[in-house]
Amino acid sequence: WTAAANYVKIKVGTGKFARKTVVLSQKRTGTLKCATMEEIEAEKSLIEKSVKERMEKTIENVKASFNSIRTXRSNPDMLDKIKVEYYGTPTSLKSIAQISTPDSSSLLVNPYDKSSLKDIEKAIVNSDLGITPNNDGDVIRLSIPQLTADRRKELSKIVAKQAEEGKVALRNIRRDAIKSYDKLEKEKKLSEDNVKDLSSDLQKVIDEYIKKVDSIFKQKEKELMTV
């Protein structure tokens, strides 16, 4: 690049965030080698992609944590975190058994390999579900007991803590993305104004995902407190 002016401005960005003006500092005389628009856009796109993937994963983790906490109604997701020692290897219960809900207050675990019944029973007993399995030699039945008022309040606190952990994870994603933008600024690929604008756009996206966590939390809390 050669120019008489101190700065060269180029337009970049067509992704999720708004189109921005990139300001590249340049000496008044001589030639300055700088990144192309395509290279800058590629780096920004990678940051956006990473942010999106990590935020979606955070929401999935929050949902999985909530699903593992039982309410008074039967739900196969309650068994998501149970690992069974299957031929010496910790294995997800759902991968070795069919789980169904005969009614609103019970679960039926039907192993594909009947020899794993005792191991499945042991895994359920050792879990924090607080449910005693009934092994009839063919399937395992789980009767979901009603939650006491104190237990509902206790579980509500656990869910609230998990929701807050999800929000912290989202804020950490924002922090990491801003560090990446700051790095591009130091490399003269983005101006200070670019970084401010991108950070502002990013905050709006994070705020939307925090609202998702709040919505999921309120729904789970409602389930827990419903008698």
Swiss-Prot record:
<feature type="transit peptide" description="Chloroplast">
    <location>
        <begin position="1"/>
        <end position="34"/>
    </location>
</feature>
<keyword id="KW-0175">Coiled coil</keyword>
<keyword id="KW-0809">Transit peptide</keyword>
<dbReference type="InterPro" id="IPR002661">
    <property type="entry name" value="Ribosome_recyc_fac"/>
</dbReference>
<dbReference type="InterPro" id="IPR023584">
    <property type="entry name" value="Ribosome_recyc_fac_dom"/>
</dbReference>
<dbReference type="GO" id="GO:0009507">
    <property type="term" value="C:chloroplast"/>
</dbReference>
<comment type="function">
    <text>Responsible for the release of ribosomes from messenger RNA at the termination of chloroplastic protein biosynthesis.</text>
</comment>
<feature type="coiled-coil region">
    <location>
        <begin position="167"/>
        <end position="212"/>
    </location>
</feature>
<dbReference type="InterPro" id="IPR036191">
    <property type="entry name" value="RRF_sf"/>
</dbReference>
<keyword id="KW-0934">Plastid</keyword>
<dbReference type="GO" id="GO:0032544">
    <property type="term" value="P:plastid translation"/>
</dbReference>
<dbReference type="Pfam" id="PF01765">
    <property type="entry name" value="RRF"/>
</dbReference>
<protein>
    <recommendedName>
        <fullName>Ribosome-recycling factor, chloroplastic</fullName>
    </recommendedName>
</protein>
<dbReference type="GO" id="GO:0043023">
    <property type="term" value="F:ribosomal large subunit binding"/>
</dbReference>
<keyword id="KW-0648">Protein biosynthesis</keyword>
<keyword id="KW-0150">Chloroplast</keyword>
<comment type="similarity">
    <text>Belongs to the RRF family.</text>
</comment>
